[in-house]
Structure formats: structure tokens, C-alpha cells
Amino acid sequence: MNAESGENAGGGCPLGHGAGAPRKRPSNRDWWPEALSLTSLNQHSPRSNPYGGDFDYAAEFNSLDLDAVIADLHKVMTDSQDWWPADFGHYGGLFIRMAWHSAGTYRITDGRGGAGGGQQRFAPLNSWPDNASLDKARRLLWPIKQKYGRKLSWADLFVLTGNVALESMGFKTFGFGGGRADTWEPEELFWGPEGTWLGDERYSGERQLHPGLGAVQMGLIYVNPEGPNGNPDPKAAAVDIRETFARMAMNDYETVALIAGGHTFGKTHGAGDPSFIGPEPEGALIEDQGLGWRSKFQTGIGPDAITSGLEVIWSQTPVKWSNYFFENLFNFEWELTKSPAGAHQWVAKDAPEIIPDPFDPNKKRKPTMLTTDLSLRFDPIYEPISRHFLENPDEFADAFARAWFKLTHRDMGPIARYLGPLVPKEQLIWQDPIPERDHPVIDDADIASLKQKILGLGFSVSDLVSVAWASAATYRGSDKRGGANGARIRFAPQKDWEINNPPLLAQVLQKLGEIQSDFNGSATGGKKVSMADLIVLAGCAAIEKAAQDGGVNVAVPFTPGRMDALEEWTDAQSFEALRPVADGFRNYYHESHFMAPEEALVDKAHLLRLSAPEMTVLVGGMRVLGANAGGSQDGVFTHRVGVLSNDFFVNLLDMKNEWTATEHKNRFQGLDRKTRQPTWTATRVDLIFGSQSELRAQAEVYGMADGNEKFVRDFAKAWDKVMNADRMDIGKPADQFSQKLSA
């Protein structure tokens, strides 16, 4: 046992309060590491933002002189600094890597990662082995950030700098959209189960990568450039490349373009033994001021720099756009060698020395490649794409430009969030486009009339609430995808998901479609109503009825203006990533999920940008409204299904109920303590609100004698937040983790 955990030979406190104990104060997490954490629901509080919760970054960015920023960045590119000299006199390669690694953490499975927020500034990303020396890139940019201040976020600066680096080396980029507001604390994300850098405990079976992760080893962005676990096998490496790039939403064509385009520039660094390298930024000394990986190998910089341990230069013109990557890849045969640092890499066999030295104009080298570069030649799928790009350099340039734009903008959501004069006009399917509104919206009188027609269709409260939730709750605050706007629940794959009860969904959509046709065919003044609006309005009408049936009159907010997406502009395969594997709000959990049900609930709430109170009130409301997937009665602690009441909390907290586990590990049976008769059934998601102390405190608020009306009004407000989470047209999206509920 290491010194931090201590040896507990005497049977005392497991945290070791002795002379040799660490100075770290034990947290609740140290005592109860398996307890459900709500930390993710409390992230990014306005209290951590030095500009305050009302800071409008979009307005600041729109006042920025972007041309001046770009001009200044062009100067930085060739202004080599003695403390970190530029390879070939140009920082382009370094800044491309910085931007790539800022954006490349994106994973399509949950939309997390990516360039938004500027998370590369914080742990653990700032200290990942794959991000070695990018601390220097950020310091090189400090004069730019310092000059433009609040008008230019670090997150936007990282991506913009990558674009300018490409442009300064003769490449034409596809465009740039600003609008990435900075975050001010690390994102608490699951990056893997390992406790050591480059660990690979994330695999099961025959190299089955953990479903929630996007990289092959802890601390890497994608793959090990030496090959799987350092095995220099290009074909095996191709398997890893295909898997990890697909999890970043890239197909084979885009993958080849990205790798080859990025490796047209710059070099890798492996001048000496990695043992000379000091700790990463988070582990460095205080006097190092956030800089890590200090090297004691000779000068430690310039020609003596060690970063990845690989020493590779791909192109004859490493600071100029060319097709040399593919020309060299196919024109030479390759033999395995090792870098000065001992890393596996490849050198062109019997090749002339045609590659420039980064610091000595009188020296030349042979072409070199990474194992993962050779994958583009020797993998049977990548090879024809690579050869096509070799023979069609203009198409390659266009493919790289588009793939780079996708890489650096994939987590930004709808194009409505893109800011600035460099936003391309072309519509791209991966942006999940929704048509702009071209008609007046419905007014209050229309809304009231439509509600009555909807309630007259004969569907239950449960039916209408379930469909509205299914439409809206696909939203992910991580990459701003999903949500009710666009009504893509009408299309594959969402219309066929089992959790959405396809037969009922089809019936509801058909009847709402009839109402839409009647209204749009008779409304005056050009007014129209979208299916997206009608689906949400149906849920709102049902909730108002459910509240009224319980004795509380509440107006559920409704803001019209959603539009309907087109099926031809809906990438079904891409939307499959939004399929719920668990949705605790509907008491749905698939056994394939890698999280416990209650953890999956918190994860879902985090993606919906809900606070703990909002999560609590929504679960309680959805249960009594009968909105469980598949009509399950688990957690439906009420005899008045369809009435919006606080019954879930009242009965959960009632001590007459005793809970026992069943043969199903996630299901429990409630018994009357006196009669031993069955009362309710529940899942782990239901019982966590009585078990976890913070959630029990929330539940008690709504279970009190005076809690019912507060519960109804808080439910309506939290419901409205979910329904509008993706509404980029009515203000800030739901990227805050809390909102003020009723007093």
C-alpha cells in the first residue's frame, strides 16, 4: 500500500492519521467512495465565473475586431521565442496540435469533450501525456489573450489559432465560428477506469473498448501512435483508429483526410530519453507556474525537445501545405526503427535525405512515419481513400478543410450558435439543421384553442406527457444536440426506439398532424404551427390538466416558434448515438449500461443541465403522471395516476413501507411493516431519493404537508426548462446547471 493510503496494521482509522500520514484532508468521498455523487449537477456555478452569471460572451465576441486578432496571430506564428523556439521558425505545427487536441476529446456517445469551454487549461487534460508541451503553446498565446481580454475566450482562441496556423502555411480553411464561452473549473468527466497514465483497463473481451470512452489509453486523445500498446503493427493500429475516430463522429474518408492533413505540417519530438522529463503541469512545483514536462536533456528545448518520444517529420515542406504526406507514404517502402528516445517509428528504406532539419538548414533527414500513418496505406479500407487523395490533391484539400471544420465545431450544436463573419454559409448535415422560421407564430388565443383540441383527442395525460418528454429529453447540453425543436422524433431512428413506445407514438403524431393540417389550412395572417410546437404543447396541456385534477391551477409556460426538420437533413446513424440506454425520468434502464441506474439518472440530468432539485421534482412528477417507459408501475407511488401530486414523495418517505430486494438486482418490493402485504414496487432510481442523504433532503421538501403546491409549480418550471433546452432562438440554451425554483 502506498504512503498516501497508509498501512492500517493496527485496525484504526483507514485514512491513517499518524506521523506518516498525508496532509490531504479526507473528504466524504474518501470514506464512502461508492456513494452516489451529485457533483456533476453542481458544476460551473456562476459563482466560479469571475465575470459573473450575467456575462454575455456572445455580445463581447460580436464586438471583437476579428481581423485584428487574426493579424496578431499571424505575427505570433513566426515570432520564435528563446524559451521555446519554433520548429522551422514557425509555430504552425504546434498550434495545429493544440487546436486538434482541444477539440479532439469530443465523443459522440454522450457529446462530452470538445473545444467548448477551453478545458485544455485544466486538469486532467492539461496534464495528459498526449498534451505534453501544449502548455507552451498556451503561454505563447497569452499576449493575444491578454490584449483582447473578455472579448475572446480561450476556447475560441485555441480553435482560431489552429485555423490561422493553417492559413499562414498556405492552406485555405473552410471557416470559423466563434461563441465558445470559457468555463472556469475542470469538467468532472469519466475519462477511464485507470489510475496510471497510458493504462488500458478500458478493454474487455477481444479488445472491446469501453462504450463510454473515445481513446485507447488513459491520457491519449485517440490512439497510441506507436501502435496498439506500443506494438508497431499498422494494420492492428488501423482497427484502433477506425474505432476511436468513429466515436468522434468521423467516417473513414474524414479520418484519412484529418490524419494526413494534420501530418502535412510540423514534427514530433523525441530527441532523447524520456526519463529526463519532469512532471506534468498539475504535478509540477509551484515555482514552475503551471508549466510541466521540464526537460534536463541537454538544453531541453529546440533540437533537444522531448514530447511524445517520437522523432518524425513527414513532409519536405513542413510549414507549407502540400501533398508530400501521401507522396512519401506511397513512394517509399518503410522499415521499422526507433527514435532517439526509443520509440517505435518508421524510416523510408533506401531513401535520400530530403527532409529539412527544424533548426539547422545545412542538415537533411530521411522521411519518417508513425505506425498509425502507415495504417493509411496498409489498411484495406484506408488504402484506396489515401491513394485517391494522392491522385486528387484538390479533393484532399477540400476534404481536410471540411473535416477540420467538423473536428473543431462538432460540439457547438446548431449553426445558430456560431458567431462572426467567417461562419460558412453552406449547410452541413452534421449540424442537424432546422429550417428558419418563415411565418408568424401562434398567439395566446390559438394556444388555448389548440390545447382544447389536443385534450379532446382521447389520449391520457400519461400518453401526451410521455411523447413530449421523449421528444425533448434527447437534448444534450454537452454538444447541444437533440431536443424538441425540429420534431425529429417523427423520423428514424427515434420513432422506432422501444423506449418511445412506437405504436403509441405513431398514433399521437398522426392525430397531432391532423390538428396541424387543420390549423395551418385555416389560420389567418399567415400563422402556422409546427409539429415540434404541438408535441410540446400537448405535454403542457396534459400537465395543466393533471395539476388541475389535483386541485392546483398552474399555467405551464409555452413559447412557440419551433420548426420542423426535414428527414433528408437528418442523419439517422448520427442520431442513433442519442438513443437512451437509460432514462431514470422514465424509469428505463438497459442492462448493457456501464453505470448503475442511479448514476445513469444523474448523468442524464447532467446532460439536460438540471440541478439536483430539478432532477428530483421531475422524477417525482413523471412517476405520478404515469410516464414510465413500457407502462411500468415501478415507482408509481400513487393511487391517482395522471394527477400531478406530491404522492411519490409522501409515500416514499412513509415509514410504514419497508423495502426488500428482489431477484432482479435493480428492483425492490415494498411491504407494509405491520401487515407484510405488498405496497409498491421500485427501482434503484426511485429508492435513491430516500437513501442518498442529499436527495432525501430534496424529497422531504416536496413530501411535507405544505409541499404539494410548491411541487406542482416547481415541476412546471423544470418541465419548461427541458422543453426549451434546445431553443437557441429564445436566449441562452440550457447550459446552466440550475435555475431558481419557487420559494
From Swiss-Prot:
Gene name for this UniProt entry: katG
Molecular-function GO terms, alphabetical: catalase activity; heme binding; metal ion binding
Crosslink site: Tryptophyl-tyrosyl-methioninium (Tyr-Met) (with W-100): 222-248
UniProt keyword Heme, yes or no: yes
EC number(s) from the headed UniProt entry: 1.11.1.21
Disulphide-bonded residues: none
Cofactor note: Binds 1 heme b (iron(II)-protoporphyrin IX) group per dimer.
Lineage: superkingdom: Bacteria
Protein name (record): Catalase-peroxidase
Record region (Disordered): 1-29
GO cellular component annotations of the record: cytosol
Keywords on record: Heme, Hydrogen peroxide, Iron, Metal-binding, Oxidoreductase, Peroxidase
Reactions performed catalytically: H2O2 + AH2 = A + 2 H2O; 2 H2O2 = O2 + 2 H2O
Subunit comment: Homodimer or homotetramer.
Site (Transition state stabilizer): 97
